[in-house]
Design a protein with these regions (language model features):
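A short, conserved alpha-helix within the catalytic core of class I
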Residues: 209-226
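Conserved class I S-adenosyl-L-methionine
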Residues: 116-125
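N-terminal auxiliary segments of SAM/dcSAM-dependent transferases
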Residues: 2-73
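Conserved beta-strand signature within the Rossmann-like core of class I S-adenosyl-L-methionine
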Residues: 226-239
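Glycine-rich SAM-binding Motif I of class I
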Residues: 127-131
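Substrate-binding/catalytic lobe of Class I Rossmann-like enzymes that use SAM or dcSAM, i.e.
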Residues: 242-337
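Class I SAM-dependent methyltransferase SAM/SAH-binding core
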Residues: 136-185
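Class I SAM-dependent methyltransferase Rossmann-like catalytic core
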Residues: 66-111
Length: 360
């Protein structure tokens, strides 16, 4: 998926289910047709159960001074389907710009990954982009262990199955596995599972920019501390009219509003009536980010986990953000993380970039 969010640190400390350094692996296979089917190797690196941890995140967001909801609410099965419609929308320029850039620069980008490396993709995302990069690595005769990391088990398994069809274990240099967990879980797993091989983390789809610049720096710092390098794709568009068309259309409206019934499902109550809320998008010039909000259509009183929260008509709950960071901003974010941009590949207009980031 293009966007994968994480769990708040406060929620983690309250509801940790697995100890920090315990990770589990599972393998499964299906052979109902009698054919030889590859096993799916999936490492459960979660330090807490995602669904259970989202409930305190919802409550924390309602209690905060600037009310917000966890972006992970958007990524249930229906949300994944709705986001596919966003990607296919003619107004959604990030998808076409990123694909064009990757297609043109994939060989150069792939040279930053050596034979024997571990390649971890943050977010079990767009198979078209992933397959392009893995096919290029295979054409360069490189042996690579690829891991897709995601919080959604079913999406992760689908991703692994599709890639195993393209890269069969018996005939391919590319070995496919999965990591089930958040970005923080992945960083913890890396620190506990150090390899003699170098690890490259791939973060495509402008997903890093779902976090504020400060949060993005913290993630980069965490991943670089394990000795890894990062390949990060980021949108640097500054045309606010184009951004609004891309992020405030009907497809995005349906995608964001889907977070409300998902919240109800997790809470076990109909606290959020989707008819009581509207979607609106706004540009935050201080953070260089587009932000999506739920806006109350009328005065509301919501009861969640035994507490009542009041909203006046027009009051908002922030849902998801998308940063638009040009190269100079990306370099600043990396410096704050103790890293540096070692190489970069830009489209002709320099409105979209892929950055190779390492420790300074």
């Amino acid at each position: 998926m293009a966007i994968t969010s994480s769990i708040s640190r406060d929620a983690k400390s309250r509801s940790s289910i697995l100890s920090k350094n315990v990770f589990r692996a599972e393998t499964s296979s299906s052979n109902r047709s009698g054919r030889d089917v590859q096993r799916i190797q999936l490492h459960d690196v979660r330090r807490q159960a995602t669904a259970q941890s989202l409930v305190p995140c919802i409550v924390d967001g309602l209690k905060s001074e600037r009310r917000q909801s966890p972006p992970l609410l958007l990524w249930n099965d229906r949300g994944l389907s709705l986001f596919d419609a966003v990607l296919d929308s003619p107004d959604y320029y990030p998808a076409t710009r990123e694909w064009s850039l990757l297609h043109n620069a994939v060989r150069k980008i792939s040279y930053s990954i050596s034979s024997g490396d571990r390649l971890i993709e943050l977010g079990a995302g767009n198979m078209k982009k992933t397959a392009l990069i893995l096919h290029t690595l295979q054409a360069q005769h490189k042996h690579v262990q690829y891991f897709a990391c995601d919080v959604d088990r079913s999406a992760l398994r689908r991703c692994i199955r599709e890639l195993q069809k393209l890269f069969p274990a018996k005939s391919s240099n590319i070995k496919i596995q999965g990591l089930l967990g958040t970005y923080e879980d992945c960083a913890a797993w890396l620190k506990c599972n150090k390899s003699n091989s170098h690890t490259s983390l791939m973060w495509l789809g402008n997903s890093m920019a779902n976090f504020t610049p400060r949060e993005a720096s913290e993630y980069i710092r965490s991943f670089l501390s394990s000795g890894s390098s990062m390949i990060i794709a980021l949108d640097g568009c500054q045309d606010q009219e184009q951004i609004a068309r891309s992020y405030e259309g009907q497809c995005n409206r349906e995608f964001v509003l889907n977070g409300l019934p998902h919240a109800n499902q997790l809470l076990g109550t109909n606290a959020f009536d989707i008819n009581d809320w509207e979607f609106v998008g706004r540009w935050n010039s201080k953070l260089w980010m587009h932000e999506s909000f739920y806006v109350a259509r009328k005065d509301l009183a919501l009861t969640v986990c035994g507490e009542t929260y009041h909203f006046r008509m027009g009051e908002t709950i922030r849902s998801i953000r998308s940063g638009k960071w040009p190269k100079m901003k990306v370099m600043e974010i990396c410096r704050e993380a103790g890293g540096k941009v070692m190489d970069s590949w830009m489209n002709c207009e320099e409105t979209y970039g892929v950055y190779l980031v390492g420790k300074h």
